């Protein structure tokens, strides 16, 4: 389920109360939650005696402190409407945090996870718990993505709507579906196409890659400050796991943290491995995400516990 709002901080077995709470979150996830509910109800109709588990994309981020999740807007919008930072890709961030703890052999450490794909988000994680994340009330916030603008001055929306007679909904559709790498490059939202274009001398493709790496590195730097240093930097998802050019571009900004990539190790694609040098003050890992496994594990734990 995309959006658990402030109702859910963990996965849970679905019952009537859970369904009502998911319905309550529809204003926060208007595109996804209704579809999620359709699936839940269809399964209830076909398999009425089979337990169902809801795994929320926002749940992992519910450990953020107020200084990270509150927006500096009048308090009534938070109290009445639950407007705050929620974050997404939580199932992926949770999996990578757990798997990285196994790989480095300890539970207490500070890391930044870079989930980089067509949709991208970063999370600051301390001892396995999320302290901050780049997406916000919606997945539109944070770094620029395949077709999403990422962080943008709200007055841009006002300006475009006023000048071009565009509705707010249409403007948000533009920011979600026609912006990001697609808009900057004028070519594609696919990073493989951007790399090919940049190699062929397309300056707009190069700008898109430069902008992406720059913004990702800015978030890593900000989260290093928020965590008072980091021990591990992880890359995951389609771009993070497979695009050695983007990883190198991001890490080129992070020398001040003591990040040092091994150029040969960084050539790997889709493999679970360290790609930093032995001298790097921050371990840099590629950790392929496995959201399906995380969902299956949560489901098994809850269903087995319910049987006891």
Regions found by a protein language model. Give the residues of each.
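General beta-strand structural signal in soluble alpha/beta enzymes
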Residues: 30-34, 51-56, 62, 112-114, ...
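Internal helix-turn-beta structural module
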Residues: 206, 210-230, 240-307
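Catalytic phosphate/nucleotide-handling subdomain of diverse soluble enzymes
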Residues: 126, 131-167, 173, 237-268
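Glycine-rich phosphate-binding loop of actin/hexokinase-like ATP-binding domains
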Residues: 63-163
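Short glycine-rich phosphate-binding loop at a beta-alpha junction
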Residues: 1-3, 51-53, 228-238
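Short beta-strand-loop/turn "lid" adjacent to the catalytic site in phosphate-handling enzymes
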Residues: 1-32, 51-53, 59-68
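Adenine-nucleotide phosphate-binding core of ATP-dependent small-molecule kinases
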Residues: 173, 180-184, 191-226
